[in-house]
Amino acid sequence: MAWPRFLQRGALLTSFSHHHLAVFLLTFFSYSLLHASRKTFSNVKVSISKQWTPNAFNTSLDLPAEIWSSNHLFPSTEEATLFLGTLDTVFLFSYAVGLFISGIIGDRLNLRWVLSFGMCSSAFVVFVFGTLTEWLHFYNKWFYCGLWIVNGLLQSTGWPCVVAVMGNWFGKAGRGVVFGLWSACASVGNILGAFLASSVLQYGYEYAFLVTASVQFAGGIIIFFGLLVSPEEIGLPSIGAEESSEEDSQRPLIDGAENEDDYEPNYSIQEDRAVVQVKAISFHQACCLPGVIPYSLAYACLKLVNYSFFFWLPFYLSNNFGWKEAEADKLSIWYDVGGIIGGTLLGFISDVLQKRAPVLALSLFLAVWSLVGYSRSPNNKSINALLMTITGFFIGGPSNMVSSAISADLGRQELIQGNSEALATVTGIVDGTGSIGAAVGQYLVSLIQDNLGWMWVFYFFILMTSCTILFILPLIVREVFSLVQRRQAHSLNE
């Protein structure tokens, strides 16, 4: 098999300028900060739960129970835990709805404005939710739900915008490697959020929210003044213009349209002619693009599992093994480390094969067995961290790949070549559908855990991972068949 052109003689690195590096870093850290603020909430759940429930007794004063309970939301830790799961669900549902809207807005307004507004506004809401309410000793379930709905809508501006900006600057050559490495932004944000939360948690959970909100607000200001959303802003040719000018430009990895006398076409592109559009495509048109619906449904199942680890892993470690909250926060970082390595390595392999679905399928198959192994992890931090890293590799890696490289492929496939106003919409559809699945999943996780225990939660994860494979099965079959035909043709030519 011949190596892709971008891997030969360092062609990929030489095609990048300092503008590409600046865009890579700014979008990377902007989404990292958004994820850090989300991670803060999951990392302080135990502290919040204690604050929202009354103490069993108080030896300093002998007062009636109603006095001690007057400033608390719930009579028991179990009810507080269930409400925390409800908040996760509320956030993800509003986040999912916001993704569909933000994708459309991002394709019609300046991406820099939308991203900066979302970051700064979300930071303010997080400050009010976690810090101001605690300083004022104001506890109200409906107020918390309302704030978290608004936060979900504001946070949804992030992913479609950053993926669209990256798609404007980085072409299909080496997209798996570049986006695989870049998609580690979510995992880096999780690590950053865990470290920030654990470092100030001893002073009170409100300071964890204060620190992450402040850093995120500052990041939004930097994005507003420093981000270039496309090469055209500084007089450089667009990615589409550069790629169309190359005589032997690479075939899109989601695109199965081969040369006319070549092999079986991929599932994702079924027309030979590119339709050139000028205006932003509609939501319905984006949904009808080949490959969008299968990957969206698959991502609904996969993101459910990935976000369950994101929201519940520190709580699981504290609840199931009795480890201290700060220790559980730091240990949960290893899941994100596995996701970073997995996303980058899987992206590289998919670039070499020039196909995404087979790589995704193999990783998800191994993810099932990694979930089985992690569910039986002993009460040993070293072994748990190792199994957690492996699980993150096979769950977080494919999740990063679908939400970044594959979404970019879908939004820039040949069927809509010449239209740069589709990427944010397509990304919003894929990630929005995934977030709906994740939203339903978070509430189910809390119910399953409360009634059946943690082992049944892992059985549920295994089922959802298997469903992910089923939804993209037609793409897997077509792309594997295409690879076999290519291999046979290569052997005949030799």
UniProtKB/Swiss-Prot annotation:
Stretches the record annotates as Disordered: 240-261
One Gene Ontology term, aspect cellular component: lysosomal membrane
Any one GO BP annotation for this protein: xenobiotic transmembrane transport
Record note on modification: Glycosylated.
Entry keyword ATP-binding: no
Membrane-topology annotation of the record: Multi-pass membrane protein
Main location: endoplasmic reticulum
Superkingdom classification of source: Eukaryota
Residues with attached carbohydrate: N58
Subcellular location: Endoplasmic reticulum membrane; Lysosome membrane
Keyword Transferase: no
GO molecular function, one term: xenobiotic transmembrane transporter activity
Spans through the membrane: 10-30, 81-101, 113-133, 146-166, 177-197, 209-229, 297-317, 333-353, 357-377, 386-406, 428-448, 457-477
Swiss-Prot/TrEMBL keywords: Endoplasmic reticulum, Glycoprotein, Lysosome, Membrane, Sugar transport, Transmembrane, Transmembrane helix, Transport
InterPro entries reported for this sequence: MFS (IPR011701), MFS_dom (IPR020846), MFS_trans_sf (IPR036259), Sugar_P_transporter (IPR000849)
Family, per entry: Belongs to the major facilitator superfamily. Organophosphate:Pi antiporter (OPA) (TC 2.A.1.4) family.
Job description of the protein: Unlike the other SLC37 members, lacks glucose-6-phosphate antiporter activity. In osteoclasts, forms a transporter complex with ATRAID for nitrogen-containing-bisphophonates (N-BPs) required for releasing N-BP molecules that have trafficked to lysosomes through fluid-phase endocytosis into the cytosol.
Assembly information from the UniProt record: Interacts with ATRAID; the interaction is direct and both proteins are mutually dependent for their stability.
Name of protein: Sugar phosphate exchanger 3
Encoding gene per record: Slc37a3
